């Protein structure tokens, strides 16, 4: 029997010896590609908010538009900029020469690193925690290396540099964003007429954005476009030339068109929101001063009470109507700050006006009419269009801090919804099924009601960035029922913090400024998406590149360039994650941290994207999450210290520190299984 099997055994041995040795681990390569795609998916789901979160938060683009633009620029950025950072991830963290005799161990380590990073990022995305993809892959790489080779396989000096960059990147990006926003606010926003200065600055902003973007592409030396053959002076010359050409195009063609559009929009200025009824002239003001008996014959949404004292000029106003709950629980006079309790009429109307620091007139009225149910009342806030009350109300809905608006009423806040539209759905009176009942009560009991009367008969006109995303989601539900019950906090802030609310109104964009900056924010968001694709695709593809090149060459120190198709593979995975789960973290980055306006969003996007692109070009794998969070917090703090949700920022900061050990532990566990069970000793 043995003599019969001997020829067969010798033949199989000869075939095995003649077969390429790389096919021995084909299963590991296939598994690596699958896990790498899942990792890219998780990167897109978690880090996409870094690119378009602020643009969606300010209402410049809708979520669908953001996904389309991000898909394009993420993919292009991953192909053009991702190769150099992938080299840092692949070779910069560990000493690959330690694996010369054990290539299989390095391949298993790459699979383990991708698995550990993917698992934690998926969990974090599900929990809506904005973590750093760079943190994940760095921690996972260190985890498998400790198991495979111990401390000798890790370049601790490179790790220290990377850890330092985690702290430097948010600080540097925050400083740059703060300086840029300070200049924009000083020379544009706070001017009596911001349009002339804004139009003058427009060519400069566009030139800087285009010039920086082109320089980053060419300086990286994208082989696909032949830029690796350009000398440094040629790169600078082409970038500056394109920037100047772009500035001339904007100055001679875009600026005149923008000026005409702004004049046309400001002159016509239709209603911006279903909750806002515009008052354009003195006649409208006078008509609102009517007898108490006439109140029931008018639409509550259109009621406006003029400020006491002489009227300086006809100001453009909006009326916001809210039904706030029981009169017994929240007395009328306790719902307004002390400086607003100027006059109380017999008919139950409280009149008041506040002069903002920038001259805007904010008026308030609280009326109890026969039309209102005895269990509640309406509160009308008539505000200048340029004030921040509308954004304040949006902000209060998602801040969800008990007592911020209703004093010590003890009401529970509105629960944050998975969709970024939950805030606007609540504001517009659209169906929202994510509520929180009071403690000890059944869900739905004693809910406050936010009502928009006659909502089904009103037509909404998409006007500017303040309400563009609100209008977009409302169009889908034009025939739906508009009355709803929302457990929400509404108002002007608690009695002790009214001055802080007025401080936040100071830097709200005027409508013409919104029109001026919304195009810039779209451009800078695309720039940020491009930079994000170049930097963060390495987090998903870096280990896969190492796995693939070792499999192909059987040389751990190979000098072959990163294949472009591998970078595109990662870009596709990032885009899929963006479309499926991207909105979850957009809610945190674009809305929860601080209210975003087009001008502040532009400053955040441009400065943080510049920081990321510079870091990508020098091969330093910094965190785009850190850069964007640093910019958002910096600009929010510069606008108003109370505009930043410091509790949320604290939670994000804590999540940054747990990411490295968690991903490292998962990767180390998988590597231990590979080393001691799966791979032969």
From Swiss-Prot:
GO-annotated biological processes: biomineral tissue development; cell population proliferation; phosphate ion transmembrane transport; phosphate ion transport; sodium ion transport
Tissues and organs where the protein is expressed, per its UniProt entry: Ubiquitously expressed.
Keyword match Magnesium: no
Keyword hit for Magnesium: no
Induction (UniProt): By 1,25-dihydroxyvitamin D3 and phosphate deprivation.
Phosphoserine: modified positions: 269, 273
InterPro entries on file: Phos_transporter
Alphabetized UniProt keyword annotations: Cell membrane, Membrane, Phosphate transport, Phosphoprotein, Receptor, Symport, Transmembrane, Transmembrane helix, Transport
Pfam families noted in UniProt: PHO4 (PF01384)
Chain segments annotated as transmembrane: 25-45, 66-86, 106-126, 162-182, 201-221, 234-254, 513-533, 561-581, 602-622, 652-672
Catalyses which reaction(s): 2 Na(+)(out) + phosphate(out) = 2 Na(+)(in) + phosphate(in)
Domain of life: Eukaryota
Principal cellular location given in the protein's record: membrane
Cellular component, GO, one term: plasma membrane
UniProt biased composition (Basic and acidic residues): 275-289
Membrane topology classification: Multi-pass membrane protein
Molecular-function annotations in GO: high-affinity phosphate:sodium symporter activity; phosphate transmembrane transporter activity; sodium:phosphate symporter activity
Spans annotated as Disordered: 266-295
Subcellular location: Cell membrane
Record function comment: Sodium-phosphate symporter which preferentially transports the monovalent form of phosphate with a stoichiometry of two sodium ions per phosphate ion. May play a role in extracellular matrix and cartilage calcification as well as in vascular calcification. Essential for cell proliferation but this function is independent of its phosphate transporter activity.
Family affiliation: Belongs to the inorganic phosphate transporter (PiT) (TC 2.A.20) family.
Protein's name according to its UniProt entry: Sodium-dependent phosphate transporter 1
Source organism: Rattus norvegicus (Rat)
Lineage of the species this protein comes from: Eukaryota, Metazoa, Chordata, Craniata, Vertebrata
């Amino acid at each position: 029997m043995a003599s019969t099997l001997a020829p067969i055994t010798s033949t199989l041995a000869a075939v095995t010896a003649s077969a390429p040795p790389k096919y021995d681990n084909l299963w590991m390569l296939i598994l690596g590609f699958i896990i790498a795609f899942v990792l890219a998916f998780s990167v897109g789901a978690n880090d996409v908010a870094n690119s378009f979160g602020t643009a969606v938060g300010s209402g410049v683009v809708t979520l669908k538009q953001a996904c389309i633009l991000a898909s394009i620029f993420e993919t292009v950025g991953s192909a053009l900029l991702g190769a150099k950072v992938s080299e840092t991830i692949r070779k910069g963290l560990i000493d690959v020469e330690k694996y010369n005799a054990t290539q299989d161990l390095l391949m298993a380590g790459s699979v383990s690193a991708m698995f550990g990073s993917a698992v934690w990022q998926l969990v974090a995305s599900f929990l809506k925690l904005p973590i750093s993809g760079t943190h994940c892959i760095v921690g996972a790489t260190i985890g498998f290396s400790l198991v495979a080779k111990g401390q000798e396989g890790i370049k601790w000096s490179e790790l220290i540099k990377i850890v330092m960059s985690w702290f430097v990147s948010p600080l540097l990006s925050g400083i740059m964003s703060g300086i840029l926003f300070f200049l924009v606010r000083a020379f544009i926003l706070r001017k009596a007429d911001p349009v002339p200065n804004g139009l003058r600055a427009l060519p400069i902003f566009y030139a800087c954005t285009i010039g920086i973007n082109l320089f980053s592409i060419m300086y990286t030396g994208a082989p696909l476009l032949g830029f690796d053959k350009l000398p440094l002076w040629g790169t600078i010359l082409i970038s500056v030339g394109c920037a100047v050409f772009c500035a001339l195009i904007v100055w001679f063609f875009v600026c005149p068109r923008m000026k005409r559009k702004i004049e046309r929009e400001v002159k016509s200025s239709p209603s911006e929101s279903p909750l806002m009824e515009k008052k354009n002239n003195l006649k409208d003001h006078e008509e609102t001063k009517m007898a108490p008996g006439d109140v029931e014959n008018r639409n509550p949404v259109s009621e406006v009470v003029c400020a006491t004292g002489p009227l300086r000029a006809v100001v453009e106003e909006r009326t916001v109507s809210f039904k706030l709950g029981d009169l017994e629980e929240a007395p009328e006079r306790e719902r307004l700050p002390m400086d607003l309790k100027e006059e109380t009429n017999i008919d139950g109307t409280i009149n008041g006006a506040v002069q903002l620091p920038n001259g805007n007139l904010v008026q308030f009225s609280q009326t109890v009419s026969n039309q209102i149910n005895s269990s509640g009342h309406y509160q009308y806030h008539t505000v200048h269009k340029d004030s921040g009350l509308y954004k304040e109300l949006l902000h209060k809905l998602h801040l969800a801090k008990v007592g911020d608006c209703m004093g010590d009423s003890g009401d529970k806040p509105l629960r944050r919804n998975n969709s970024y539209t939950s805030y606007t759905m609540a504001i517009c009176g659209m169906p929202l099924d994510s509520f929180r009942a009071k403690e000890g009560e059944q869900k739905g009991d004693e809910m406050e009601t936010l009502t928009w009367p006659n909502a089904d008969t009103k037509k909404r006109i998409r006007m500017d960035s303040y309400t563009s995303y609100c209008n977009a989601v409302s169009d889908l539900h034009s025939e739906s029922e508009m009355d709803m019950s929302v457990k929400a906090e509404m108002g002007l802030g608690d009695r002790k913090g009214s001055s802080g609310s007025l401080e936040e109104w100071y830097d709200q964009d005027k409508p013409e400024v919104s029109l001026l900056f919304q195009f810039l924010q779209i451009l800078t968001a695309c720039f940020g998406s491009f930079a994000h694709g170049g930097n963060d695709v390495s987090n998903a593809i870096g280990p896969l590149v190492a796995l693939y090149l070792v499999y192909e060459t059987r040389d751990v120190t190979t000098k072959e360039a990163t294949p472009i198709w591998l970078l595109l593979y990662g870009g596709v995975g990032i885009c899929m994650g963006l479309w499926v789960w991207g909105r979850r973290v957009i809610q945190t980055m674009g809305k929860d941290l601080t209210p975003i306006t087009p001008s502040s969003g532009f400053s955040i996007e441009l400065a943080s994207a510049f920081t990321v692109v510079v870091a990508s070009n020098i091969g330093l794998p910094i965190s785009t999450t850190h850069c964007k969070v640093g910019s958002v917090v910096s600009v929010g703090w510069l606008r108003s210290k109370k505009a930043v949700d410091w509790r949320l920022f604290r939670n994000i900061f804590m999540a940054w520190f747990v990411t490295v050990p968690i991903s490292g532990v998962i990767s180390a566990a998988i590597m231990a299984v590979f080393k001691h069970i799966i791979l032969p000793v």
